[in-house]
Amino acid sequence: MRRRLALSILALAAGAAHAAPDDIVGPAFRHPAEGALVLLLLEKSTEPHLVPGDKLMLAQLKSQLVIAGYRTAVLDYADYQLLEADEAAGGGERDPDGRLVVGLLARQRALAKLARIAAESSHCALVIRTRFVIRPAPVVDNFFAQWDGARRALKLTDTAPRANPDGPGRTVVGALRGLGSGLSIELMAYDGDGALAFTTHGAVAVPYVTRLGEGRVEWRDDLFFGDGDVADGMRIALAPMR
């Protein structure tokens, strides 16, 4: 009860969260007992602009689980990659150039196998893999994007030269519509029997600044100046643990 209350309070602090439509909670998933060991697996970002957020993401996953009453330890991602490569080779997935392709099924099988192996040696309740993903984010109310349980502000600027006092770089007041992109945390968890516990997502931020005057979009340079957005995204993604 105490651990669920702790996560519920964290969720209220982040605002109301609604699960993404493609989130999955396994039919056999049950909350681990208080004090259970949860093993964590960080998939490091390959996009340079996201790399600074990896440590923040892992730190938030650890701290929020500890607050909820669980013990945590971090697994070596290289061990998972070996299993992943084996599963991909067994599946025979290859690109047009003949190179091995690591698809979703290979990732799932590798994580399930890792969870079974880890449970035999550590008696862990879950293995949770965390990573950043870019997700579709519909624009709402002109200045916001809404996806994966949260609404986040768009960052819009107009850098075109102007004669008025506002000048270049002023914030544009205008209407945007359509589908944008949002940065989310993805959690994929398997229990000690190798069964899927859950796959969830939590919105972090709109990772791009739209420079309307120049007609281009680029990565924000202030994406990880603090960990507040990462913390909120993790609270949303950890909803099945409440």
Residue ranges of model-derived segments:
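N-terminal segment of the mature soluble domain
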Residues: 47-139, 190, 196
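Positively charged n-region of N-terminal signal peptides that target proteins for export
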Residues: 1-4
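N-terminal start-of-chain detector that recognizes signal peptides
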Residues: 11, 98-102, 156-162
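Amphipathic, alpha-helical segments enriched in basic
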Residues: 40, 93, 102-107, 162, ...
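Bacterial N-terminal signal peptides
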Residues: 6-15
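Short beta-strand segments enriched in small/hydrophobic residues
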Residues: 35-46
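C-terminal/domain-edge helix-coil "capping" segments
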Residues: 19-36, 136-138, 142-242
